[in-house]
């Protein structure tokens, strides 16, 4: 049997990490929507402790931090299992390490977001990094699935028209999401009082 077909443990972990990341993004939106982003004034602790009283905005903000911390551990385990698996494709190992690097950089931006009191540039970068990581872990989930048997390098010229449209759509969605983050973090959501026109 193809060794790639047998190596499904890291695929399952990447799949779990994908849904975990989606949940974390949703939780992050709740934190912002409830005005809880600065409910914990310090980082990585909350009022000097890792176990604050989980009430009001502290509940959402600290829960967001705990779930994010669990994601770092989950993805690190997935990467380790992937390295130990029979699937030796270098691209998977490289991009897994890139994922860990993204999570570490993301942690720095989380700290800066709290310390600098939500500057919109850093908050938007925090959101953009989250979407980049979601993209990365989704791709890792796809290429480690039992259905994925492609081991050859593929470039953009070899993509079908449908695949090119998919890539373009992903880029546009990412751009729109980041732009939406800028609008939200700068408080410009209601600058235009009517839709689809603006004044």
Each language-model region and where it sits:
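Polytopic transmembrane helical bundles with strong interfacial aromatic enrichment
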Residues: 2-199
